[in-house]
Amino acid sequence: MEILVLNLGSSSIKFKLFDMKENKPLASGLAEKIGEEIGQLKIKSHLHHNEQELKEKLVIKDHASGLLMIRENLTKMGIIKDFNQIDAIGHRVVQGGDKFHAPILVNEKVMQEIGKLSILAPLHNPANLAGIEFVQKAHPHIPQIAVFDTAFHATMPSYAYMYALPYELYEKYQIRRYGFHGTSHHYVAKEAAKFLNTAYEEFNAISLHLGNGSSAAAIQKGKSVDTSMGLTPLEGLIMGTRCGDIDPTVVEYIAQCADKSLEEVMKILNYESGLKGICGDNDARNIEARKEKGDKQAKLAFEMCAYRIKKYIGAYMAVLKKVDAIIFTAGLGENYSALRESVCEGLEDLGIALHKPTNDNPGNGLVDLSQPDAKVKVLLIPTDEELEIALQAKEIAEKLK
């Protein structure tokens, strides 16, 4: 079975094609800067007998044009003979709201609901829907499965996902915590349970997906019971350009003091805050280099980021009571050893103790970073959201045969 995974952003398309016999990628790639003056198309073949890479700068007018280019080059490069040989397509859909708690086979009704949920994810859901609509028109016989970023967190109890606002705002406008990165949190939690030889249904963990966008999740008996992101991905941890948790009154105060519109303030919170807001840079490598040279702003940004993560670990340990593992994943979680060290520092009384030499040089793949006698394992697990989407799509596609 061959499954194509599509992840359409506001101006990009990421894809990965899998052979599900061995869960191995056949090809992967990216179309970016869609709608801009000059875009870029990258496609890499992972076939042993046909290793090649395409990199091309060209105009990519819209998402449909990008998908056409990907389809054309998959056959031109000899990765597949015909696009119609693909058994199913799994789509990453960012916002499933209260409607979608699990992956679902796409039909007209599902497409309408994804469209309606665009109000909660105006940058992402319309792009996700554009990919679904393209395939529906061009290849109506290929089953499409929508996999929602929010679905893993659908198991949160109401006391964790509700905001202390007038209840009618939830009833009328569905204002609540949804959480994101669910596919990633789910994938690494399953990998961790497998690695520790623990039944997933009994597994408790704190998963830290740390990238330019970051979130923490409390996982109890294999299910999400709390997460740091909220109605949108703005809440929670300090991120590359997002502020994370702040006093809501700050929005009004900035608007008044700086004479900004609501839209302008939200732009500041989403794109000009976080690490970038504190030190002018959201590239962790630059921040680390500056910090080592004694740059005070870089040091402050780093310390604020680590401190916020540490606070969430403490909160989630109180929620879970028993924790089998702390999981670090995604770009920063997998590659930023100094951040992992700072986050875990001083948590020995909670059973968390890093083995510094392993943390500094973890190598590749899944690694246990903890001291041998540590009560709580600290694991570095590379995430693979595309594979998790493919696995969930496969489960539904197989039932159709």
UniProtKB/Swiss-Prot annotation:
Q: Name one molecular function that GO assigns to this entry.
A: ATP binding
Q: Which residues form the active site?
A: D149
Q: Which PROSITE patterns match?
A: ACETATE_KINASE_1, ACETATE_KINASE_2
Q: What is its EC number?
A: 2.7.2.1
SUPFAM superfamilies assigned to the protein according to its UniProt record, in alphabetical order: Actin-like ATPase domain
| Enzyme class (EC, first level) | transferase
Give the residues the record marks as binding Mg(2+).
N7, E385
Q: Which cofactor does it need?
A: Mg(2+); Mn(2+)
Q: How is the cofactor bound?
A: Mg(2+). Can also accept Mn(2+).
Q: In which pathway does it act?
A: Metabolic intermediate biosynthesis; acetyl-CoA biosynthesis; acetyl-CoA from acetate: step 1/2
| Disulfide topology | none
Provide one Gene Ontology biological process annotation: acetyl-CoA biosynthetic process
Please tell me where ATP binds in this chain.
K14, H209, L210, G211, N212, G213, D283, A284, R285, G331, L332, G333, E334, N335
List the catalytic activities from the record: acetate + ATP = acetyl phosphate + ADP
| Domain of life where this protein originates | Bacteria
Q: Which positions in this protein are listed as binding substrate? A: R92
Q: Where in the cell is it found?
A: Cytoplasm
Question: Any idea which UniProt keywords this protein has?
Answer: ATP-binding, Cytoplasm, Kinase, Magnesium, Metal-binding, Nucleotide-binding, Transferase
**Site residues (Transition state stabilizer), renumbered to this chain:** H181, R242
**One GO cellular component term noted in the UniProt record for this chain:** cytoplasm
Q: Which InterPro entries match?
A: Ac/propionate_kinase, Aliphatic_acid_kin_short-chain, Aliphatic_acid_kinase_CS, ATPase_NBD
Q: According to its UniProt record, which protein family does this protein belong to?
A: Belongs to the acetokinase family.
Q: How does it assemble?
A: Homodimer.
The record's annotation in HAMAP family points to: Acetate_kinase
Q: What does this protein do?
A: Catalyzes the formation of acetyl phosphate from acetate and ATP. Can also catalyze the reverse reaction.
Q: What is the official name of this protein in its record?
A: Acetate kinase
Species annotation = Helicobacter pylori (strain Shi470)
